[in-house]
Amino acid sequence: FLFPLITSFLSKVL
């Protein structure tokens, strides 16, 4: 799974 992508997405959301 694309963990880096999820982290980036969460960072934008938060």
Curated annotation (Swiss-Prot):
Tissue expression summary: Expressed by the skin glands.
GO biological process, one term: defense response to bacterium
Family label: Belongs to the frog skin active peptide (FSAP) family. Temporin subfamily.
GO CC, alphabetical: extracellular region
Native species: Aquarana catesbeiana (American bullfrog)
The protein, known as: Ranatuerin-9
Ranges in coiled-coil conformation: none
Transmembrane keyword on record: no
